[in-house]
Amino acid sequence: MNKASRQKKIRELIENHEVSGQQELLGMLEKEGIVVAQATLSRDFAEMGVVRNRTSDGGYRLAVPEEPQVDIIKGLVGMEVLSVASNETSIIIRTLPGRAHGVGSFLDRLTNDNILGTIAGDDTVLVIPSTVRKISSVKSYIQKILSQP
């Protein structure tokens, strides 16, 4: 089963059942014929934004936030970006002071296999591509996402 299908099923189970934690969800997934490692489930939770909310009886229930209004988020993050530049090995994003972490986190949450990861300082984000051969396509992708010329 691919990641998108698995995450769709996770969302469905969390929304339709009172799931208190990862172990319970792992059991529910197994009953559905989906065998997944706990580490993979943790990564899925992080990507999906799954949180544990306290219930009125003092217990916990997993919850998946509604799909964010991606265009609004992109616009807000894009307003924090001053420039996007690259060389042969990496991409640098200059941001308003204090905004690099948010921009880096936004990029980390995108599902682009060509972005290996980001490192953020105060006003600069270093984007590390999966391969140097993808520099121009990753830079174009970032500029498109963040609406930068």
Curated annotation (Swiss-Prot):
UniProt key word Transcription: yes
GO annotation, biological process: L-arginine biosynthetic process; protein complex oligomerization; regulation of arginine biosynthetic process
InterPro entries according to UniProt: Arg_repress, Arg_repress_C, Arg_repress_C_sf, Arg_repress_DNA-bd, WH-like_DNA-bd_sf, WH_DNA-bd_sf
Gene3D superfamilies: 3.30.1360.40, Winged helix-like DNA-binding domain superfamily/Winged helix DNA-binding domain
Highest taxon in the source lineage: Bacteria
Keyword Nucleotide-binding in record: no
GO CC annotation terms, alphabetical: cytoplasm
Molecular function terms, GO-annotated: arginine binding; DNA binding; DNA-binding transcription factor activity
Disulphide connectivity of cysteines: none
Compartments it resides in: Cytoplasm
Keywords, alphabetical: Amino-acid biosynthesis, Arginine biosynthesis, Cytoplasm, DNA-binding, Repressor, Transcription, Transcription regulation
Function recorded in the entry: Regulates arginine biosynthesis genes.
Similarity annotation: Belongs to the ArgR family.
Protein name as catalogued: Arginine repressor
Organism (species): Chlorobaculum tepidum (strain ATCC 49652 / DSM 12025 / NBRC 103806 / TLS) (Chlorobium tepidum)
Lineage: Bacteria, Pseudomonadati, Chlorobiota, Chlorobiia, Chlorobiales
